[in-house]
């Protein structure tokens, strides 16, 4: 699993984006060029937090949280065939309960 292979630094979070539907409700298939980037996913790894005045600030998100993030946030990476997104905690807009 990716969380054992990736150890984010500082206030970074590794997210597995939600898979998009390949097919619309009406049965039509959506080409890759027409698909929108996902804006939610599951946290698979969390950094230790950022430093502020020589004190480490703990992270607000944890592994397993479902989150919403900005459409163009983070850096897309592929690790062992798994598509992941590395973003800063400040790019996380909300945690989905």
From Swiss-Prot:
Tell me the GO BP annotations in alphabetical order: chaperone cofactor-dependent protein refolding
Compartment annotation: Cytoplasm
InterPro entries for the chain: Chaperonin_GroES (IPR020818), Chaperonin_GroES_sf (IPR037124), Chaprnonin_Cpn10_CS (IPR018369), GroES-like_sf (IPR011032)
Main location class: cytoplasm
Q: Which SMART domains match?
A: Cpn10
Q: Which GO terms describe its molecular function?
A: ATP binding; metal ion binding; protein folding chaperone; protein-folding chaperone binding; unfolded protein binding
Q: Which SUPFAM superfamilies match?
A: GroES-like (SSF50129)
Instruction: Give me the segments passing through the membrane.
Output: none
User: Which GO CC terms are listed, alphabetically?
Assistant: cytoplasm
Q: Does the keyword field hold Cell wall biogenesis/degradation?
A: no
Any idea which UniProt keywords this protein has?
Chaperone, Cytoplasm
- Which family does this protein fall into? Belongs to the GroES chaperonin family.
| Function in brief | Together with the chaperonin GroEL, plays an essential role in assisting protein folding. The GroEL-GroES system forms a nano-cage that allows encapsulation of the non-native substrate proteins and provides a physical environment optimized to promote and accelerate protein folding. GroES binds to the apical surface of the GroEL ring, thereby capping the opening of the GroEL channel.
Assembly with partners or alone = Heptamer of 7 subunits arranged in a ring. Interacts with the chaperonin GroEL.
From the Swiss-Prot or TrEMBL record, give the protein name. Co-chaperonin GroES
Naturally occurring in which organism (per UniProt): Gemmatimonas aurantiaca (strain DSM 14586 / JCM 11422 / NBRC 100505 / T-27)
């Amino acid at each position: 699993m990716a969380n054992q292979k990736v150890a984010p630094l500082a206030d970074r979070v590794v997210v597995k984006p939600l898979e998009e539907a390949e097919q619309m409700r009406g049965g039509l298939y959506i080409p890759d060029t027409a698909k929108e980037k996902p804006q939610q996913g599951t946290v698979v790894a969390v950094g230790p937090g950022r430093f502020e005045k020589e004190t480490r600030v703990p992270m607000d998100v944890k592994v397993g949280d479902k989150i919403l993030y900005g459409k163009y946030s983070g850096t897309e990476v592929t690790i062992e065939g798994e598509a992941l997104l590395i973003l800063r905690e400040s790019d996380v807009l909300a945690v989905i309960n």
